[in-house]
């Protein structure tokens, strides 16, 4: 991750009007606006978010801002421009940094900074990012946040008005493919279908559970085939046979492993 302060050459205070976070491997950008950000000093495309009270700009609009400052991908002489700058392919990050983010439309530019130089209020925002997400039955989601908060969400309520989510709501396998967005900025299905962490944190039903408690359950109450065999005083082959005959029900399995709830293994022992 690389961090840049967005400054305005025409602003004599030289203060940062925004901060750009670049994730090179993921090829994603996010913009954070300071708490004291002034709409009149903020880049135009970002000021509209500020007026709505949003200070974290999602990946889509952050990338739009970046794209407005670099050579467009449909430029007729793009190949020559890339060769002249030693680039083998169109790389938004490299095109942005080679000019320090300057463009002819305004006086904004980028200055590299270290993580210790970002505003302290960003630390609090980071605590409200997503740590993990678990898909539950009936389009429910269990979302863990970095500050320890856990919330249960109904995706129907979250996204039913957004037609882009229809395939997710209509297909369980697609729904279960939910992932944490880059650096916890939200949850996503694929690259562009995302729900921001701020919306998730502000809504949903709080659950009296912590990530550590959840880990404790998994650590103490989930066993593999070898542990199940030891508990039942039998071989792994016997455990596999019980699973094949529907006497034990794996909660997760792959080509070379099976995981079981310890409680079910214990119940089998009593029969």
Question: Residue ranges of each PLM-predicted region?
Answer:
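Broad phosphate/nucleotide-binding scaffolds in NTP-utilizing and phosphate-metabolizing enzymes
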Residues: 1-121
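A short, polar/charged loop-to-alpha-helix boundary motif
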Residues: 27-33, 160-169
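Short, solvent-exposed cationic patches
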Residues: 35-47, 165-184
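DNA-contacting interfaces and partner/effector-binding or oligomerization modules
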Residues: 114-167
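A short, Lys/Arg-enriched interface patch at domain edges and termini
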Residues: 194-213, 264-271
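Polyanion-binding surface elements
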Residues: 214-236
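Helix-turn-helix DNA-binding helix
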Residues: 239-240
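Short helix-start
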Residues: 245, 249-271
């Amino acid at each position: 991750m690389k961090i840049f302060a967005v400054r305005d050459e025409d602003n004599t205070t030289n203060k940062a009007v925004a901060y750009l976070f670049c994730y090179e491997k993921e090829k994603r950008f996010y913009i954070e606006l300071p708490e004291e950000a002034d709409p009149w000093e903020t880049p135009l495309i970002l000021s509209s978010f500020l007026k709505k009270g949003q200070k974290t700009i999602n990946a889509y609009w952050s990338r739009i801002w970046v794209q407005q400052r670099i050579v467009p991908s449909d430029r007729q002489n793009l190949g020559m421009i890339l060769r002249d700058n030693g680039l083998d392919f169109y790389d938004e990050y490299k095109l942005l940094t080679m000019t320090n983010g300057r463009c002819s439309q305004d006086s904004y530019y980028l200055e590299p900074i270290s993580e210790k130089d970002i505003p302290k209020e960003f630390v609090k925002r980071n605590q409200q990012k997503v740590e993990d997400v678990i898909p539950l039955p009936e389009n429910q989601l269990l979302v863990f946040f970095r500050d320890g908060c856990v919330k249960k969400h109904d995706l129907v309520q979250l996204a039913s008005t957004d037609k882009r989510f229809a395939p997710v709501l209509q297909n369980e396998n697609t729904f279960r493919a939910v992932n944490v967005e880059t650096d916890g900025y939200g949850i996503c299905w694929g690259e562009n279908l995302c729900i921001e962490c701020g919306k998730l944190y502000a809504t949903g039903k709080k659950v009296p559970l912590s990530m550590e408690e959840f880990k404790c359950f998994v650590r103490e109450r989930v066993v593999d085939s070898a542990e199940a065999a030891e508990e039942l005083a039998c071989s792994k082959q016997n455990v596999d046979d019980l699973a094949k005959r529907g006497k034990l029900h794996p909660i997760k399995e792959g080509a070379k492993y099976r995981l079981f709830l310890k409680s079910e293994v214990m119940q089998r022992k009593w029969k």
